[in-house]
């Protein structure tokens, strides 16, 4: 279990109490949830309310692999400069069903809409892989470093 392998109390103190910026990528975004169901039911960090569930689509494979656009729902420093570049690389079979619409920054459609960028205070999560997303991904990292 991931929770058994990290000094969670130290991490939580730095992120929640001291306000250090945190960026979760792919599964790193998913662990921000209250719980997830990949390989059984597991607790997450609970920093952004919601649950991680398997992708359900009648017409598409249950694993989302490849390039897809994000639809920006609200402004966020993480997405500064991305008005014209919104294509990112995804590899996942689970999605974060976010509890509060206020935490959804962008969504993506893969059979159904899912949260692809989330944020709450100093905590950010992206379902895609910025490290594989060329210029758009570089901009995400730059924006995060500038927060």
Briefly describe each language-model feature range.
Residues 1-65:
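Cysteine-nucleophile active-site neighborhood
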